[in-house]
Every structure is written in structure tokens, then in C-alpha cells.
Design a protein with these regions (language model features):
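Terminal targeting segments of Actinobacterial cell-envelope proteins
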Residues: 1-16
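Intrinsically disordered, low-complexity segments used for protein-protein interactions
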Residues: 2, 37-41, 479
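Hydrophobic single-pass membrane-targeting/anchoring helices
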Residues: 12-44
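Alpha-helix initiation/capping motif
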Residues: 16-18, 35, 94, 255, ...
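N-terminal low-complexity, Pro/Thr-rich disordered segments
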Residues: 41-80
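Extracytoplasmic/lumenal domain signature
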Residues: 64, 68-86, 91, 98-137, ...
Length: 517
């Protein structure tokens, strides 16, 4: 990505790339060698895995008659993925990235607290433009909201290299910040089943699992380096919000690999939470056909994995959208195969959104200006049941003197798809026909992914204003209900919960916004 420097890690030096077939062969290398390699990439893993969980990941195969158990699926009223706690525990709340939070939405809000109370959450980091100061929270940066031990906890990562846990009512720190080695840009994930665990990626190469039951201190239980993949590419960040399905973690990295990790969660004799992770699936997010079409190796995975009916969907910065059937793996087996492939032509960092009928909504950027981008547009609806011709409709989203397309993840609401664009156009598209019903204009770039709760659309702009619009009559341009001025461009996605809105901005702070009294 080249347009905005606030999102991306420094590019890797060019590396020799194995072909897709060669990668599969590599994964099938001798058992002893693979086992040795796998133990070398973990910290905190047991040296004596179970027979099944200790096996190396197998190459993609046809799952045959494997029948998945019912999976977290969309409905006309999306529900959170959580089974053990109340809250918003991952980016967009569930496996289909369609749960936006819980009302009521505030009616006349103001800033009730700022964290920190003064100064900012800032850190030095380097990218292609050099070393500079980054502040606040970025893309996607949606706070987790978790009801925990009688309190509302707000959990998030920030540009000061740290994970923070603060009180939802007053913004006071509830735990000591956990320091990583670089910026945290993505949305952290709280364990949806109630284990005191937090899953977080950082720009320091590491995907981590943190324990939250050690008093006021978060403790690292496990980490996975982006550089441990056989052929890491492009970047070493982990922007995607990890997805936990039962006892499995699904995640894509900017090293362009997709992982399914068996967590083996539990508790020790002292009642402290434990994990014993094992990689069950590890496949590249690209293939030879994509590299040939692109002519370069910019193929990192920055989207958050979506999941429906046993299939994990994700996209990469080369525009490749994939669906991998991992149903057998989630039942304890090894078989997995790619069942869906679609090329958008350009960088696709927004997460795939899945509606209640199983359709996919995909948003791509417009930077390469190639023939494929012109052919399929930048906002599209796909039918994965028709893998040879999945495009249902598409909407072109041109630039205005610069890059076009979308960085934000669209929101599905009733008959509409709400899609903020890089140029500041907020599009409302009929999700059946693909026709634009209405649009708004906000100061660009609008990277914040919209959230909709109780027919109220909430999103931020790059002038630092958080807006709320009335969507109760979706066929008309919505009137603005209120706005709140924050400090700095709002790239992060808001979280709505019980009368409060929580969001960070590039000015350096995270805010609690609600009605006074």
C-alpha cells in the first residue's frame, strides 16, 4: 500500500518465492524436520504434544464426506460470537463480521473520558517514509468491550506499542499496559468463551496470547513470529483481528500465510489459564497465478478472517479472495482444501463480510489501475456457491486525483450495504441490485469501518469528527443526529455498547463518549 503511511509496516526486502506447488511440497517434508521446525517457532508450547495435536499440518486435501458441525453463522439479526461472556470481543463482533454492538445509542453525547487524561499514546516506528512518531489508534483499532467481573472493560492496542485495559465508565487503567516491540494497529480479540485470554498482533513480528488472570499484569503465554513461515513475504505485521472458533484460532498474517491453530485452552492446578497451541493448518495466501498476474509480491493478508459453514474467507493485498474449507480440521482432523478463489485486481485489506444468505461482500482499493480492477469494480457482492462465476454485482469507486476504492470494511444493514470510500464518499448500495441509493460526503480519507446499532449509523472522518446518522428510513439520505469533535483523524472503528461509544483517534487518545448523567 502506498497512499497513506499511517497503516503499513516497512516493506520487506525482495525474497526468493517458492511456487504454490513448491510450498505444498515443503509442508510435506520429513516428519522429523517439520516437527523440529514447529517446536522452534513457539514460545510456551509443551514439548510433549498429544499424538494428534503434535502432528505437522498436512497439505491441502479433499475433505470428502467430512460434515462440519453447525458453525457461527449469520442471521437476519446478527449475534455476537461470544458463548461465555457479554461484549464485543473481536472486530465486528462475530465470525461473519456482522455484529456491531449493543444499544441504546447515546442521544446527545459528549466526551465523558479521555485515555490518557493528558498526552498521547505515541511511539516511534519506521516505514518506507522513514522513522517518525505515530500516535493514538489506527486501522482497524476497534476496542473490545467486555463485561468482566462486574465491570465493563475496554481492551485495545495502540501506537505506544502497548495493550491497554481500562474501565468503560471512567477510562481508568484496570491493568498495567503490556508492552510489545512496536505499534499495534489491528483489533485485539478477547476469548469469546470466557477464558481470561487476549489475542493480539503487533508490528514487532509477533502474534501473542496474553493471560489476564495474573492480577494487574498481563502475561505472555505464547507467541508466533511472522518470520517463522517457510517463505514470509512483504511485511511482518499482524493487522487482522484473530478469530476464535471453539478451541481454534484462525488468523492471516502480513507474511501472507493463513493459520489455523489448536489452542488447547485449560487451567493449571492453581486455577490459572493455560494454552498449549499447535498449528493445524498453514497455507499461503497467494498462488502462482496471482504472482504472475500482479508482476510483484505485494501479497500480505491484512484482513480479518471471516467464517461461515466450515469455510474461512480472507483476502490479501494482491486482491486474491480465498475460501478454505477447514471443517474437518475444526472437528479434530487434518483435511483442508481451497474451495473458493476470486481475484479483485487490487489491494483488498477490508475484511470479507458474509450476510445471512451466505453472500460475500468484498471491498478493494484502487491503486494498480489494471484491467481487472476496471472489470470488476471495487465494491462487489460474490456468491461462493458459484465459484466459476461468483460476481453478483459490482460498483466502481474511482479516485479523485489519487487512489480510489475502499479501505473500510462495509456494513450490511437490512437492504443496504454501507461503504465508506478513500475519497470520503459514504455509499449506500442496495444489496440486491448493487445500485447506489444515496451517498454522504465526509473529509477523507474515510477508513473507519461503519457500525450500525438500533438503526443509527456511526462512523468517523479524517477531520476528527464522529458522526451519527438516522437510518430508520434506509431509502433516503439519512439526517445527522449528532456529532462529536475528537483529536486527530479517526481511522479506527467505533465500538457501541449500552449507551456508550468507544473509539480512538490519531490525535493520541481513546475516548468514552455518551450522554451526560
Amino acid at each position: 500500500m502506498t497512499l497513506m503511511q499511517g497503516r503499513h509496516a516497512a516493506e520487506r526486502s525482495p525474497t526468493h518465492r517458492l511456487g504454490f506447488t513448491g510450498l505444498v511440497v515443503l509442508l510435506l517434508a520429513g516428519t522429523a524436520a517439520v516437527a523440529s521446525w514447529r517446536f522452534g517457532i513457539f514460545s510456551g508450547a509443551s514439548p510433549e504434544p498429544s499424538a494428534r495435536d503434535g502432528d505437522p499440518p498436512s497439505a491441502p486435501t479433499d475433505p470428502g464426506e467430512a460434515s462440519p458441525e453447525p458453525s457461527p453463522s449469520p442471521s437476519s439479526t446478527p449475534e455476537p460470537i461470544n458463548t461465555g461472556i457479554e461484549g464485543l470481543t473481536t472486530f465486528r463482533g462475530n465470525a461473519t463480521r456482522t455484529y456491531h454492538g449493543r444499544g441504546p445509542v447515546p442521544e446527545d453525547p459528549e466526551i465523558l473520558w479521555r485515555y490518557p487524561t493528558s498526552g498521547g499514546l505515541c511511539g516511534q516506528s519506521s516505514d518506507a517514509a522513514g522513522t517518525r512518531l505515530w500516535c493514538g489508534t489506527g486501522w482497524t483499532g476497534q476496542p473490545n468491550v467486555v463485561e468482566w467481573e462486574g465491570r465493563i472493560q475496554i481492551r485495545f492496542g495502540a501506537y505506544d506499542y502497548a495493550v491497554h485495559v481500562v474501565g468503560g465508565r471512567n477510562g481508568r487503567a484496570l491493568m498495567e499496559p503490556f508492552r510489545t516491540g512496536d505499534l499495534i494497529k489491528g483489533t485485539v480479540t478477547s476469548d469469546p468463551d470466557g477464558y481470561p485470554l487476549l489475542y493480539v498482533g503487533s508490528r514487532d513480528n509477533q502474534l501473542r496470547i496474553l493471560a489476564l488472570d495474573r492480577g494487574r499484569t498481563m502475561e505472555e503465554l505464547w507467541s508466533l513470529s511472522a518470520d517463522s513461515a517457510p517463505d514470509p513475504t512483504w511485511n511482518d505485521d499482524w493487522d487482522g483481528s484473530p478469530l476464535v472458533i471453539d478451541d481454534y484460532l484462525l488468523e492471516g498474517g502480513e507474511n501472507s500465510w493463513f493459520y489455523v491453530v489448536k489452542l488447547n485452552r485449560g487451567y493449571d492446578g492453581q486455577g490459572r489459564v493455560t494454552v498449549n497451541p499447535r498449528i493445524r493448518v498453514m497455507v499461503p495466501g497467494y498462488d502462482d497465478e496471482l504472482i504472475a498476474a500482479l508482476g510483484d509480491e505485494q501479497v500480505s493478508i491484512e484482513s480479518s478472517v471471516a467464517f461461515h459453514d466450515g469455510v474461512a474467507y480472507f483476502a490479501n493485498s494482491g486482491g486474491l479472495v480465498q475460501g478454505w474449507d477447514v471443517s474437518d480440521v475444526l472437528l479434530g482432523g487434518d483435511r483442508h482444501r481451497r474451495v473458493f478463489r476470486f481475484w479483485t485486481g487490487d489491494d483488498t485489506d477490508a475484511s470479507v463480510v458474509i450476510d445471512e444468505e451466505g453472500y460475500l461482500y468484498v471491498a478493494s482499493e484502487l491503486e494498480r489501475l489494471n484491467g481487472r480492477s476496471r472489470e470488476v469494480g471495487q465494491l462487489m457482492k460474490l456468491d461462493p456457491r458459484k465459484p466459476k462465476d461468483p460476481l453478483v454485482w459490482s460498483v466502481p469507486v474511482p479516485g479523485e486525483g489519487g487512489a480510489g476504492g475502499l479501505w473500510a470494511t462495509p456494513a450490511v444493514h437490512g437492504r443496504l450495504v454501507i461503504a465508506p470510500t478513500n475519497t470520503g464518499r459514504i455509499l449506500a448500495v442496495n444489496r440486491n441490485t448493487g445500485r447506489i441509493r444515496w451517498e454522504l460526503r465526509l473529509p477523507p480519507p474515510t477508513w473507519t469501518s461503519p457500525v450500525i446499532v438500533d438503526d443509527v449509523l456511526i462512523l468517523g472522518d479524517c477531520a476528527g469528527v464522529l458522526h451519527a446518522y438516522d437510518l430508520s428510513r434506509p431509502g433516503r439520505e439519512p439526517p445527522e443526529l449528532w456529532s462529536v469533535q475528537l483529536e486527530g483523524c479517526i481511522e479506527s472503528t467505533p465500538a457501541v455498547w449500552d449507551g456508550m461509544v468507544y473509539v480512538g483517534a490519531r490525535g493520541g487518545a481513546v475516548y468514552g463518549i455518551g450522554d451526560r448523567g
